[in-house]
Amino acid sequence: MPTSPFIDDLIRDRRAKRGFLDQPVSIEMVKDILSAAKYAPSSSNTQPWRCYVITGEARERITTAAVEAYRAAPEGLPPEYPFFPQPLHEPYATRFNSFRGQLGDALGIPRSDITLRRRDVERQFRFFDAPVGLIFTMDRRLEWASFICYGCFLQNIMLAAKGRGLDTCTQVFWSMQHPVLRTELNLPDDQMVVAGMSLGWADNSLPENQMSISKMELEEFTTFVHE
């Protein structure tokens, strides 16, 4: 049977990394990653994605503004779109709570420690110290199908980065920073902030980057229909 072990390994090895080394990533490498990712499928070739590459002084300015905005409103600004239903129902609530507990244990943050939890959120808005931050926007007049297309584009970026030895963390939290990003990036009103992404060389010595995340077995999410 034909196999593609390289692609399969990239998919299995990709993980969200929440801490990066102080090691630069060349703009040429970022361009190569995005140039490969643009071949993602999209409905009727609509290609709804738009990407902002944040580095250098701009990265420092934007992350500082984002952290300051979060400190001014630590309960969080309304995101451009809802992340989860409230309350989150089963089986998703169990999976969510299991992951958050595992991450909290790796970070050494008890759920009751609001100060440390907020400090961890601030790390999100510093792109987890990655040298490159990506911000993704989409025309808000588009409908739900475009989010499916966007997911394909984001996955392509993650895999293209992984194939070059880099790692990523996709962060929907950046959607809550749309006022800051609208100002800093001069975003038009018709562009909604979909997500951000940290891109760099992972610091795999960090406990949070050594987590083993369980996935459903094939039989749990697949139904084979023969007749």
From Swiss-Prot:
Induction info: By nitrobenzene.
Enzyme Commission number: 1.7.1.16
Keywords linked to the UniProt accession: Aromatic hydrocarbons catabolism, Flavoprotein, FMN, NADP, Nucleotide-binding, Oxidoreductase
Top-level lineage group: Bacteria
Protein name: Nitrobenzene nitroreductase
Highest classification ranks of the organism: Bacteria, Pseudomonadati, Pseudomonadota, Gammaproteobacteria, Pseudomonadales
Reported pH dependence: Optimum pH is 8.
Stated regulation of activity: Inhibited by dicumarol, p-hydroxymercuribenzoate and salicyl hydroxamate.
